[in-house]
Design a protein with these regions (language model features):
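N-proximal low-complexity "stem/linker" segments adjacent to membrane-targeting elements
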Residues: 1-24
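Short, acidic, metal-binding catalytic loop of nucleotide-sugar glycosyltransferases
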Residues: 23-32
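A conserved acidic beta->alpha catalytic loop
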Residues: 24, 38-48
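Short beta-strand/loop segment that forms part of the nucleotide-sugar
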Residues: 31-41, 62-67, 91-92
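Glycine-rich, basic loop-to-helix element that forms the pyrophosphate-binding segment
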Residues: 66-82
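Donor-binding/catalytic cores of nucleotide-activated saccharide
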Residues: 71, 94-205, 213, 217-229
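Short aromatic/hydrophobic "clamp" motif used to bind/position activated sugar donors
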Residues: 87
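Membrane-interface aromatic/basic loop that binds lipid-linked glycans or pyrophosphate carriers
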Residues: 278-341
Length: 341
């Protein structure tokens, strides 16, 4: 009998915290498959912990060991090995709320039994801030109908802080394979591609107003730490260019809500890239900013380019006296309010 869901857990030197993540996933029982992808860990006991869980729970846990390929290759490896109807990535320093997980899986079981399983299941996620012990939830009650099947026609407007992220989605595994997505190796921030590229293949969705995913944030070495993002801005640019290239948004003109959301997502990616290039502040970074907008212009249609220029992404590319100071200041205020990194 097919598993209801495959959880992929990319692990790289994660021994200090991965057990907590795995234990929350085990609460799903035999409905779930847990794929622990050891991404060439060498500094701690991560490989042994993966093998330990696979031996202890042979009908649930798979241990996959690969040469280091980065987070994206861990996700790719999970998709290659997944046998579940649905696929969800859970980073090894994050976890799922077990009560919410049981409710989500029960609902999915019911929908599958009725023959109405959605292509995409969406839930809330919670930022867990280690530095001050606070948390805040990103929910979508103003965007999606609750507790029923819907399509793109019924999707509302997203606020800038409301993007769908890897934390909030469960895709049907078939959709991920159908779209042909292969995440780039040795690149951070590929979770944006994971959410974005399959969207045109999604015909049905379901939203549950449950705080399922717990996103641990605040480690000094974390990829979303501001100083780390400035150092890795070239990887952010690589992901943004991949997203520019992976879908033809003009082909979606008859799906206005889907196209509008994908333009919104692309504009956010352009804005993030701009801001971290401004934070870098070097002449080289300024040139990369110019090149990124030129890349967008050359690799999309005039209508897509114009739409992004007139959005939040365009605001971060304005030029006026002290514009860089104003834009970075706006980012600092937003960061303080929304606490997104």
């Amino acid at each position: 009998m097919q598993k209801l869901i495959s959880f992929a857990v990319p692990c790289y030197n994660s021994a200090a915290y991965m057990r907590h993540c795995i234990e929350t996933l085990l609460s799903a029982g035999e409905q779930a498959e847990i794929i622990l992808v050891d991404d060439g860990s060498t500094k701690d006991g991560t490989p042994a912990i993966c093998d330990e869980y696979a031996a202890k729970y042979p009908t649930i846990v798979k241990a996959v060991h690969q040469e280091n390929g980065g987070h994206g290759e861990g996700v790719n490896q999970g998709i290659r090995n997944a046998t579940g109807l649905y696929y969800k990535v859970v980073d090894s320093d994050d976890w799922l709320d077990t009560d919410a997980l049981k409710k989500v899986l029960h609902r999915l079981q019911t929908l599958v039994a009725r023959g109405t399983a959605p292509d995409l299941m969406i839930c809330n996620y919670v930022y867990e801030h280690v530095e001050d012990g606070t948390s805040h939830t990103v929910r979508y009650t103003n965007v999606f109908p609750k507790d029923r099947l819907f399509d793109w026609v019924h999707v509302g407007h997203f606020r800038p802080d409301q993007n769908l992220l890897m934390h909030s989605v469960m895709y049907r595994t078939e959709v991920l394979r159908q779209c042909g997505m292969v995440l780039p190796k040795h690149t951070f921030y590929v979770d944006n591609i994971f959410v974005y590229q399959p969207l045109p293949y999604v015909k049905s969705m379901y939203y549950m107003d449950l705080d399922l995913y717990r996103y641990f944030i605040g480690r000094a070495d974390q990829s979303v730490n501001e100083s780390v993002m400035v150092k890795r801005v070239d990887q952010q640019l690589r992901v943004t260019k991949h997203m520019i290239d992976c879908q033809d948004l003009d082909a979606l003109k008859n799906q206005k809500r889907l196209r509008a959301y994908m333009l919104h997502y692309l504009s956010i990616m352009m804005a993030i890239s701009d801001i971290f290039l401004l934070l870098d502040g070097s002449a080289e970074a300024r040139e990369k900013k110019i090149q990124l907008w030129q890349y967008l212009k050359e690799h999309t249609s005039p209508s897509v380019y114009r739409a992004v220029r007139l959005s939040l992404g365009g605001i971060t590319n304005l030029h006026f006296p002290k514009s860089d100071t104003v834009i970075v200041g706006g980012y600092r205020i937003a960061r303080k309010i929304f606490k997104f990194n």
